[in-house]
């Protein structure tokens, strides 16, 4: 990974993702898109530095940057943030190993991060790249978020 790149980033317009090249593209695309998804390797110093430059409260940044194994989301006035439990993306592993995905979601920016590869991120990324994700709400199967319907 280069010094100025997330693991990957997409800008979404009309429900379709367009891959972004680096942090500068992610920062610059804000007003021209519906939302931006940036996925970080939180073990990288560059990713941590980019995360700390976000205009979010310090406690939000510290929570998502921390290497913790907590499965909990918090709702603030203009964002949802925290950690989701997931499984490591290790195709040759005999057993499933737990992992943690950090999340910060606002209306225009979704930031996810991990220290190890995770299955759900790999699956969503492959669907975005294949243009198969439909522009509809994603069901939260973790039992943490649920709709009122």
Regions found by a protein language model. Give the residues of each.
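Peripheral, non-transmembrane regulatory/ligand-interaction domains of membrane transport proteins
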Residues: 1-149
